[in-house]
């Protein structure tokens, strides 16, 4: 039986996958400090080259460059964020976690 997958079915399946990963994502967040979560969420919502720019920090309520640096140290060590060498942009490594964080109001 052939069936053409509709955009609605793709969207619904994607939502189900995100929901099925929710417990894992929440476990990841429980291991992090509030400052680390703030950095991770900022990167998910707005990947950037200019993580330490005053405007970016203000938009995402990031308090200090030192806090960002410490957060990045942990987040890169846990393989949660990376800086792409070619574009020099900070992003969340796991695309599902990225989407979940970007949509979530933390």
Task: Kindly label every feature range from the protein language model.
Residues 19, 23-106:
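C-terminal leucine-rich, beta-strand-based interaction scaffolds used for sensing/assembly
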Residues 1-23:
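Amphipathic alpha-helical "lid/sensor" segments that cap RecA-like P-loop NTPase cores
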